[in-house]
Amino acid sequence: DSHCGAFAVICMVLLAMTQWSAFLSMEAAPLLPLALIPVASRASAAMAVLSLRPMRTSQYSAMERGGAPVFVAAALLAAACALPIVLWSSFAPLAAAIGYGLAVWYGFRQFEGMSGDISGFGLVLGELCGAVVLALGR
C-alpha cells in the first residue's frame, strides 16, 4: 500500500518475527490453551464492542444495541481463561485477554471511543501476548 508508513511496516515485521519466534519455540506446548487464545481475545472483543462507547465516525455508532448480552461474552471469557489454568497451569488465554484489554484501553483513550480498528489492534496484540506467554510457560 502506498499510504502505509515506514513505522507501520517496521511494526508489522517486528510483530511477524515475534509471532514466528513464539510459535517456533513451543514444540511441547499443550494445544488446548493455544486454541483458547483466540477464543479469549474474541470474547474480550465482544465485551468491548458491546460495552464501550463507540467513536462517532465508527461503524459501531450506527449499531443497534441488543442481541447477546455482555454477560454471555463474559462467561465465555471466564471459561476460556479458567479451563487452561486449572487443567494445564497455562495462563496464555488470560494473557491474551489482558493484552487485548490493555491495547483497547490505550486506543480508546487516544481516539475517545471504540472502533473496529481499535478492536483489531487489540486482537493482534492480545493474541501475541497469549502466544508469548504460552511459549515462555512451557
Residue spans of the language-model regions?
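Short amphipathic alpha-helical coupling elements at transmembrane boundaries
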Residues: 1, 61-66, 120, 124
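Multi-pass membrane catalytic core of lipid/isoprenoid biosynthesis enzymes
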Residues: 1-28, 33-34, 71-84, 124-130, ...
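Transmembrane helix-loop junction
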Residues: 24-25, 50, 109, 135
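Alpha-helical transmembrane segments of multi-pass membrane proteins, especially transporters
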Residues: 34-38, 62, 92-97, 122-123
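Transmembrane alpha-helical segments that form the membrane-embedded catalytic/substrate-channel core
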Residues: 36-51, 97-107
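Solvent-exposed interhelical
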Residues: 43-77, 110-114
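Hydrophobic core of alpha-helical transmembrane segments in multi-pass integral membrane proteins
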Residues: 71-89, 93-104
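Interfacial loop-to-transmembrane junctions
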Residues: 105-129
